[in-house]
Amino acid sequence: LSRDTSLGAIRPDLEQVWKTSNEVAAICYAVAKQAFGRQPDEAMMAGLLHSIGRLYILMHAHQNDPTMRQDPAFAETLETWQPIIGKAILEAWGLPQRICDAVENQDYLLDGGSAELEPLTRLLSAAKLRHRLEVEPELRLQHPDAEFLLGSVNLGKGSFMDLVAVSQADIASMQQALAA
């Protein structure tokens, strides 16, 4: 994709998908390793693929109607549909159902979802929200309870936020490895 000149108009969006996916994957990997001591690769895979639906929609819009992206409703449609489309793609690829379900429910924290969801889903949703809070400061205004929501996520050996705090070196190392 990096060499395809026909993607010029959406290149910044594609680069953002790649960067976000890598950063969320690094958080998922390091926290899963700390929380569960097992399956960090599965958590990393969920993080890497959580935006596959966004990638599909962006490519489809670019190839079929590039003006679609100027429609004011496009951003909301993209946010609403990307987890559903992502799950469908991952199921078609035969990925484990836990990963597919986590991708579908990646926004459960902000959507007021249940704390009874699978640990991988809670982890992915928390990692995505934490990343968004770092790169979208306005999100704190839209969701003043976002920090509280993150603090309420418990995984294995502790709270998500405590696990992130003790995993900072692993997160940074994994982000660097994925970005290379």
What are these regions (language model features)?
Residues 9-14, 65-77, 101-105, 137-155:
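Short alpha-helical "patches" and their helix-cap loops
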